[in-house]
Amino acid sequence: MKIISSTHLKELDKYTIANEPITSIDLMERAAHELTRTIMRRWDASFHIVVFAGPGNNGGDALAVARLLSQQNYRVEVFLFNTKGKLSEECQINLNRLKECGSIYFTEVSTKFDPPVLTEKHLVVDGLFGSGLNKPLNGGFAAVVKYINASKSPVVAIDIPSGLMGEDNTYNIRQNIMRADVTLSIQLPKLSFFFPENEDIVGEWELLNIGLKTEFIETVESSFFTTEEVEIRNLIKPRKRFAHKGAFGHGLLIAGSYGMAGASILSARACLRSGIGLLTVHVPIHNHDLMQSTVPEAIVH
């Protein structure tokens, strides 16, 4: 699977809208349905949902999810942060739709924010900022993130934890980044998911396929890929019924040193695991008996 930049992800959205064709708000609704189904699979209706939505399209996703969860009899509370008095077009549409749901407790935050009580029975839906963020969170947004991080509530992030950038986080402020238990990434993973320092920020991540156009992804150049099961499966050829070890290649492994036989043993086992027919291993004399006893299939010299 190809990993593309946040800029290319935006272009992927635009390409899908133009070539499916589908409107931006309908594509957002499709994503919201996938997000909602996944949240419902992981957390039942005993959880009190608390949605934190930002002014952009990530916030629009969050508002749509809030509406859909409410329709499934979840208790939902929404905080929309609109400190500049301007929402994206899709966020505004989903706000209008949300207001038609009378069962949702809704607060629009423009200045002062009185945070709700958060316990382990509340599920925080993080929809403050998406992968397009290009600077660290500060001020009020950083304070909100710190408040949520200090709570005992599980957090599910929409697309990416708020405050985490899609690629380079060298100059980011780590204490101002949302720490998610689960991240529901739309269509493709973000490069920052694969850095060990972000493990406790991203948590467990799951990809949600919302039908973005794969032909665009194929045209984008990238240096980063993940290896998927389907790609490996195509490399494994069916074996003939009467085939024998002589039909599957003969490998030579030269490895090991005195007192450090582990790497040579693991390498030999890996060779055999790959399906090779015969394996000859050359090791130092001190490792000969150990190799022969632990990897009896190998021809040891």
Where does each model-flagged region fall?
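Internal gly/pro-rich beta-alpha loop/helix module
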Residues: 121-123, 128-224
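Short gly/ser/thr-rich secondary-structure transition/capping motifs
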Residues: 104-111, 138, 163-168, 232-237
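Small-residue (G/A/S/T)-rich helix-start motifs and N-terminal tracts that mark the onset
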Residues: 1-80, 88, 182, 193-301
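Nucleotide and nucleotide-moiety/phosphate-recognizing core
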Residues: 36-128, 136-158
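Short, hydrophobic beta-strand segments that form beta-sheet elements in well-ordered domains
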Residues: 105-109, 157, 185-186, 280-284
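Short, ordered loop/turn segments at secondary-structure junctions
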Residues: 81-84, 160-161, 188, 284-287
